[in-house]
Amino acid sequence: METLFSLPFTVLECPNVKLKKPSWLHMPSAMTVYAVVIVSYFLITGGIIYDVIVEPPSVGSMTDEHGHQRPVAFLAYRVNGQYIMEGLASSFLFTMGGLGFIILDRSNAPNIPKLNRFLLLFIGFVSVLLSFFMARVFMRMKLPGYLMG
């Protein structure tokens, strides 16, 4: 394998380039990287790529039995389609659940006082459980009759 990789370099000569890092470029802090990851996770799980390509409306409308137009936030019976508000709400729940797991992990630090540990555990569990059960409610709204035992 080594001979296979070195074969092109018997003919080609690598240039002697000396690159320096610009002085204004610094390593970002951990919280900056964390914020970028969370925001990108929020946008990707919200379906920003789908929203840009398909350009769905922010909310839909449904005609009730009296002939009145009623706004709806969920595109029912369509797994492969969504309104913008539906994607943002689901994305918020997924991000809240992920942050709940991170809060639960942070509650294991050895130097946290007992009250703060209890509060972190409580907030983490509430975030994870709330996001899980609300995602199930959203699935029930999206696909009526699904997950009905």
Curated annotation (Swiss-Prot):
Chief place of localization: membrane
Transcription found in the keyword field: no
Regions that span the bilayer: 33-53, 84-104, 118-138
Stretches of the chain found on the membrane's Cytoplasmic side: 1-32, 105-117
UniProt xrefs under InterPro entries: OligosaccharylTrfase_OST3/OST6, OSTC
Keywords: Membrane, Transmembrane, Transmembrane helix
Any one annotated GO CC term: oligosaccharyltransferase complex
Keyword Membrane tagged: yes
Gene Ontology biological-process annotations: protein glycosylation
Segments on the Extracellular face: 54-83, 139-149
Compartment annotation: Membrane
Pathway(s) the chain acts in: Protein modification; protein glycosylation
Superkingdom in the source lineage: Eukaryota
Membrane association type: Multi-pass membrane protein
First and last residue of the signal peptide: none
Pfam families with a match to the protein in the record: OST3_OST6
Function summary: Specific component of the STT3A-containing form of the oligosaccharyl transferase (OST) complex that catalyzes the initial transfer of a defined glycan (Glc(3)Man(9)GlcNAc(2) in eukaryotes) from the lipid carrier dolichol-pyrophosphate to an asparagine residue within an Asn-X-Ser/Thr consensus motif in nascent polypeptide chains, the first step in protein N-glycosylation. N-glycosylation occurs cotranslationally and the complex associates with the Sec61 complex at the channel-forming translocon complex that mediates protein translocation across the endoplasmic reticulum (ER).
Assembly and binders: Specific component of the STT3A-containing form of the oligosaccharyltransferase (OST) complex.
Family, similarity comment: Belongs to the OSTC family.
Protein name according to UniProt: Oligosaccharyltransferase complex subunit ostc
